[in-house]
């Protein structure tokens, strides 16, 4: 048996190491192909980054400040990411939102990054800045401003008119980022120019990048360098082909990174895991592409999204759930990833029409942190377990990944084991998963490995290990627990910490009912059980071996100064590892030299510090919650939670404990259907008296668009400066009596709709689908027209956002508006067209809320969606009880006050439903929801899927007056009413979060040039 075991271990190691050479430690700035560094605070070798000389695993979460337009809440999100055990955040900035007006980059109010940088520094998170200029990110046009779309040059090419268009924005953002670099005491440690720049039409993978593509990347890098950016640059190659890696020439970046989404996007079938993108050899790919830099994944799938007519983000959360996190994230660790960014960790909201047509208002993304900033999804806790393990495992950072081989180390071909071999350390790590990673079945196995006490097969005390369906585990050997050697453990490490008086506390966990085993050197005292039962302890050779079956009740053992907690995974979820503040310049940033506390504390613990004889904690609870200090670097006798001293006691094993009492607060929310609503017609354009003199005449006889127009003039909205929200066209003609039909081919993006009137006569609507970007149709005219009389078509089109694009395709330029038209009995030139979008187009007036927040509807052009419009002359009408009796657009407004209790985070949402009995609630209609001027919901009744629209505190005034407006667009002749609209609260959370200042909410005033 012993010889068979030796052969099995040797064979497994041979297979594993075959293509896994060890690298000698050297700094990449010494490599021949490495450019000279511009600073010395962020450096690297082939294994990892060094920040201020300390080797760090960069574990990052993606979070976009523009998707949460309340700067006072950014710190809350940062703290929740920090509490995951992450040490960084990656963020995009959206050029299209900041420079909607050419040459005018808005950087104040919600568009200022100052508070973002301050909050990151205070929370202790490094930042990876990604200013684009193209960002993708499910944003309209991928973040390219609408005015750039009408330029002749190909987007993302070296065309001079495109490159010059980026200059003002990149210079402005570059200076802002440069000021916030680590070299200036800020949090920014990496910068990414461009985004997923990896293809070009008619250029093969082997030919890419061409010189032109290299020039584009080099131009973006130079813009940043010229602005003062000195931290390393990084690329995110979504093809994983080595594009722009160090040493590749013009356009190369300092660090090479990839991005990948192996779980794909089928949120409608979330239990079916796709297999065709599951990676198996990334460690080799990286060695081929960039052997002198650490393996970096700059975007990895943290959720997914769906579109109009699809499913809600809940399905996306199931697709990339805690099981997927366990399997596919750990697969990445098997490749030795050392810079790891999860896209998204907090998604936020596509408010104000900022999204592309493939998504609805929510950008929850099924992420670990929900759109309304809650952390109840299990994958939040799973990510916390993983990040904290890697944080306390320096051996991982220099380990050499081997090959994952079916049957290696276990003899079970249904199981794949991927080793990571100690490279300068004695620690080896073994990642175990199903050979079929999608398997939902369970497998039994024994693990045969080499340790410092010889070759062993785990478990040694009988039984077998088990791997449940869609699971993956770290097994470790000769793992350093602050000077104590953990010879092996089949249970996973959550964390370990240094306590007072040279004590070490180790936390292990496993799944319910699993058999696990660990071993300690025999020179330690025999482990004793000080809490719990049913633990088997035996001496095997030169080791103490401990075996147990995971249960809800924890076990605690001691072996001299080493204390081991054996937890059920779901109990480990309730534990938090909090870094204590250090001296500058580390302060709240992560560092392997920092002291930590481990506290069992329920829903969320945010921060900790020790003063005198007290441990101060900030955190959140949603039920009465016991606190227990599992480990701390010094002894203290009191616990202060959110500024309140708690009654503390000592547990049987000597841990300090206390209880945070939770009392649900009394909450009073308005009944929206009982409020006094005011109404104004928002489609006066179909009245006989309407004068469109102030509208934009569509007289351009040319376009730079890749799609040629067919009429005498171009009708594309982008060519006239209108880029989002909604569009209204008016086509004037004089009748000749031969009119019987009109043909219209309209474009609004997937999910769009349109309605058409001839004078005051409703001709019908296209109500939209989850597939059509455009819709051509012939419309019969209902009656004969009077020859010689003037007529006008009014066409309302919903603008769902521009597309994203692969480089060079110019897909984002595909026009919105009327593409083609014809009128029977007439030449095309007989119709004279005008249009409007948002008031002023690119010269938009509400700089506070950005260029896309408004559309073409009359009430929006007048600014009536802003607080305190002149409603005294409007009639009273309720959109929920009364609504519209015919096709058209109504605008409804009301106000209410809130007075929610201090000290609680109370997520609020507006919820639409069509459960009312009135027939008109089941017709096709669309609503926009404006809250204190911000458009925070686009509701499509018959298409969906979104019915619930979270609105954060700071947009809603939790202690003050709120102005809410709803546009109601009835697409059918019988009209529409809103079946139901409620303001609802999620469970109030007793919170240590910082109450946010309201986002800027400038109110209504008469608008210059409004029509």
UniProtKB/Swiss-Prot annotation:
PANTHER family reported in the protein's UniProt record: BETA-GALACTOSIDASE RELATED
Entry similarity comment: Belongs to the glycosyl hydrolase 35 family.
Protein name in the entry: Probable beta-galactosidase E
Gene Ontology cellular-component terms listed: extracellular region; vacuole
Function statement: Cleaves beta-linked terminal galactosyl residues from gangliosides, glycoproteins, and glycosaminoglycans.
Main location: secreted
Cross-referenced Pfam families: BetaGal_ABD2, BetaGal_dom2, BetaGal_dom3, Glyco_hydro_35
The species this protein was found in: Aspergillus fumigatus (strain ATCC MYA-4609 / CBS 101355 / FGSC A1100 / Af293)
UniProt-annotated location(s): Secreted
Disulphide bond pairs: 267-316
Lineage, top ranks: Eukaryota, Fungi, Dikarya, Ascomycota, Pezizomycotina
EC number, as in UniProt: 3.2.1.23
Keywords: Carbohydrate metabolism, Disulfide bond, Glycoprotein, Glycosidase, Hydrolase, Polysaccharide degradation, Secreted, Signal
Glycosylation site positions: 202, 406, 423, 446, 455, 588, 622, 704, 745, 759, 772, 778, 913
Gene (name only): lacE
GO MF annotation: an example: beta-galactosidase activity
Reaction(s) the record says it catalyses: Hydrolysis of terminal non-reducing beta-D-galactose residues in beta-D-galactosides
Residues the record lists as binding substrate: 92, 136-138, 195, 261, 365
Top-level taxon of origin: Eukaryota
Active site as annotated: 196 (proton donor), 299 (nucleophile)
GO biological process, one term: polysaccharide catabolic process
InterPro entries: Betagal_dom2, Betagal_dom2_sf, BetaGal_dom3, BetaGal_dom3_sf, BetaGal_jelly_roll_dom, Galactose-bd-like_sf, Gly_Hdrlase_35_cat, Glyco_hydro_35_CS
Annotated signal peptide: 1-19
SMART domains in alphabetical order: BetaGal_dom2
């Amino acid at each position: 048996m012993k010889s068979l075991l030796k052969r099995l271990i040797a064979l497994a190691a041979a297979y594993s190491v075959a293509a896994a050479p060890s690298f000698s430690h050297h700094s990449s700035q010494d490599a021949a192909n490495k450019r000279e560094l511009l600073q010395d605070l962020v450096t690297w070798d082939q294994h990892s980054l060094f920040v201020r000389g300390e080797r760090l695993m960069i574990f990052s979460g993606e979070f976009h400040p523009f998707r949460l337009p309340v700067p006072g809440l950014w710190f809350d999100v940062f703290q929740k990411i920090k509490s995951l055990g992450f040490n960084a955040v990656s963020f995009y900035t959206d050029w299209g939102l900041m420079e909607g007006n050419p040459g005018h980059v808005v950087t104040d109010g919600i568009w200022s990054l100052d508070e973002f940088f301050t909050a990151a520094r205070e929370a202790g998170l490094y930042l990876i800045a990604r200013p684009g200029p193209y960002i993708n990110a499910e944003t309209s046009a991928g973040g390219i401003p609408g005015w750039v779309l009408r330029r002749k040059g190909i987007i993302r090419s070296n065309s001079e008119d495109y490159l010059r268009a980026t200059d003002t924005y990149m210079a402005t953002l570059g200076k802002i980022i440069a000021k916030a670099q680590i070299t200036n005491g800020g949090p920014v440690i990496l910068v990414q120019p461009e985004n997923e720049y990896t293809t070009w039409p008619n250029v093969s993978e082997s030919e890419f990048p061409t010189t032109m593509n290299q020039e584009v990347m080099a131009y973006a890098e130079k813009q940043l360098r010229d602005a003062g950016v000195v931290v390393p640059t990084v690329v995110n190659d979504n093809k994983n082909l080595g594009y722009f890696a160090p040493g590749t020439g013009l356009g190369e970046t300092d660090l090479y990174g990839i991005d990948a989404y192996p779980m794909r996007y089928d949120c409608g079938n979330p239990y079916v895991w796709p297999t065709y993108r599951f990676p198996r050899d990334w460690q080799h790919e990286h060695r081929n592409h960039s052997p002198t830099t650490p393996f970096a994944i700059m975007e990895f799938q943290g959720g997914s999204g769906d579109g109009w007519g699809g499913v809600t983000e809940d399905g996306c959360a199931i697709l990339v759930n805690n099981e997927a996190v366990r399997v596919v994230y750990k697969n990445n660790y098997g490749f030795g990833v050392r810079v790891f960014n999860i896209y998204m960790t907090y998604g936020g909201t596509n408010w104000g029409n900022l999204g592309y047509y493939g998504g609805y208002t929510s950008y929850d993304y099924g992420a670990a942190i929900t759109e309304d900033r809650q952390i109840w999804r299990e994958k939040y806790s799973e990510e916390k377990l993983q990040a904290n393990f890697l944080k306390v495992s320096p051996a991982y950072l220099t380990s050499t990944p081997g090959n994952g081989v079916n049957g290696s180390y276990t003899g079970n071909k249904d199981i794949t084991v991927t080793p990571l071999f100690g490279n300068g350390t004695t620690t080896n790590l073994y990642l175990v998963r199903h050979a079929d990673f999608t398997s939902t079945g369970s497998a039994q196995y024994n693990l045969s490995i080499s340790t410092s006490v010889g070759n062993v097969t785990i478990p040694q005390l009988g039984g077998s290990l088990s791997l449940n369906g869609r699971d993956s585990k770290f097994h470790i050997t000769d793992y350093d627990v602050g000077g104590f050697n953990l010879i092996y453990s089949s249970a996973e490490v959550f964390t370990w910490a240094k306590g007072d008086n040279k004590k070490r506390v180790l936390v292990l966990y496993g799944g319910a009912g699993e058999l696990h085993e660990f071993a300690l050197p025999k020179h330690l005292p025999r482990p004793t059980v000080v809490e719990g039962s049913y633990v088997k302890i035996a001496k095997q050779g030169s080791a103490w071996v401990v075996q147990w079956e995971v249960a809800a009740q924890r076990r605690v053992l001691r072996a001299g100064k080493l204390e081991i907690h054996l937890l059920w995974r779901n109990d480990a979820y309730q534990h938090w590892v909090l870094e204590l503040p250090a001296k500058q310049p580390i302060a709240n940033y992560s560092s392997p030299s920092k002291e930590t506390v481990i506290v069992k504390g329920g829903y969320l613990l945010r921060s900790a510090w020790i003063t005198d004889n007290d441990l101060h904690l900030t955190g959140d609870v949603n039920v009465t919650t016991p606190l227990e200090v599992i480990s701390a670097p010094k002894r203290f006798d009191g616990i202060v939670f959110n500024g309140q001293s708690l009654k503390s006691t000592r547990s049987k094993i000597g841990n300090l404990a206390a209880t945070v009492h939770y009392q649900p607060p009394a909450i009073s929310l308005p009944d929206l259907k009982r409020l006094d609503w005011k109404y104004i017609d928002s489609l006066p354009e179909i009245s006989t008296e309407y004068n469109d003199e102030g509208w934009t005449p569509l007289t351009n006889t040319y376009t730079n668009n890749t799609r040629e127009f067919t009429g005498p003039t171009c009708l594309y909205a982008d060519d006239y400066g209108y880029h989002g929200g909604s569009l209204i066209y008016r086509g004037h003609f004089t009748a000749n009596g031969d009119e019987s039909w009109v043909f219209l081919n309209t474009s609004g993006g997937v999910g769009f709709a349109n309605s058409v009137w001839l004078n005051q006569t409703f001709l019908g609507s296209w109500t939209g689908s989850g597939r059509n970007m455009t819709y051509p149709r012939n419309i019969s005219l209902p009656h004969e027209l009077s020859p010689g009389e003037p007529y006008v078509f009014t066409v309302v089109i919903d603008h769902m956002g521009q597309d994203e694009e692969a480089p060079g395709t110019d897909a984002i330029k595909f026009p919105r508006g009327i593409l083609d038209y014809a009128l029977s009995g007439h030449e095309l030139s007989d119709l004279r067209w005008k249009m409007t979008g948002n008031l002023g187009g690119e010269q938009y007036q509400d700089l506070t809320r950005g260029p896309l927040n408004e559309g073409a509807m009359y009430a929006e052009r007048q600014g009536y969606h802003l607080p305190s419009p002149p409603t005294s002359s409007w009639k009273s009408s309720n959109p929920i009880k009364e609504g519209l009796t015919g096709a058209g657009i109504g605008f409804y407004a009301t106000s209410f006050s809130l007075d929610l209790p201090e000290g609680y985070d109370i997520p609020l949402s507006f919820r639409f439903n069509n459960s009312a009995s009135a027939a008109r609630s089941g017709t096709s209609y669309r609503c926009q929801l404006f809250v204190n001027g911000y458009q925070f919901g686009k509701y499509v009744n018959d298409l969906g899927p979104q019915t619930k629209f979270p609105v954060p505190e700071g947009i809603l005034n939790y202690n003050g007056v709120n102005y809410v407006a709803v546009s109601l667009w009835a697409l059918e002749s019988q009209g529409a009413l809103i079946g139901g609209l409620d303001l609802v609260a999620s469970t109030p959370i007793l919170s240590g979060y910082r109450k946010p200042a309201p986002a800027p909410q400038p109110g209504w005033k008469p608008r210059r040039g409004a029509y």
